[in-house]
Amino acid sequence: MIFTIGNKIYVNQTFKKSFQKANINYSKFSAQPTILNNVLWYAVAETDKNYTMAFYSIFDNNTRPTNFINIPKNHTLVDVNHPDIRTLRWFSNEFYTLSSLNNNQVIYKDLRYPLLDQKDSTSSLFSFKLIKEGKRWNTKSLSEERF
């Protein structure tokens, strides 16, 4: 536990410096260890139009992350102040992206957790299909459709 706290402080500073060095002007960011890990860390930073993600291992030869993944927010695809969407926004601590399927369906991806595949920006661990039914947005887990 003590190592995790120490690593958290170190990794936060490392990500802040790497975003600054890469000229990524963020309004907020979050860094956390990957699942069941204290060595490999993940961060997501919010900019005006995108989220920028990076991974960093405390055993890396590099002193900071250098590979960044940019994902557009697309927050204009739905009314983000709709009560159903506000609940999802709260759940994901405002770190989310949207992508359109069709007029009544949107994919909501929670970005708090690392991508399942670093090379695939759509491989979010928590993804939901939002289905517009009347005045409500109903959710269906995309993991149900994957398996």
What are these regions (language model features)?
Residues 1-11:
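Internal/C-terminal transmembrane anchor helices
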Residues 15-17:
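GHKL/Bergerat-fold ATPase module in large chromosome/replication-associated machines
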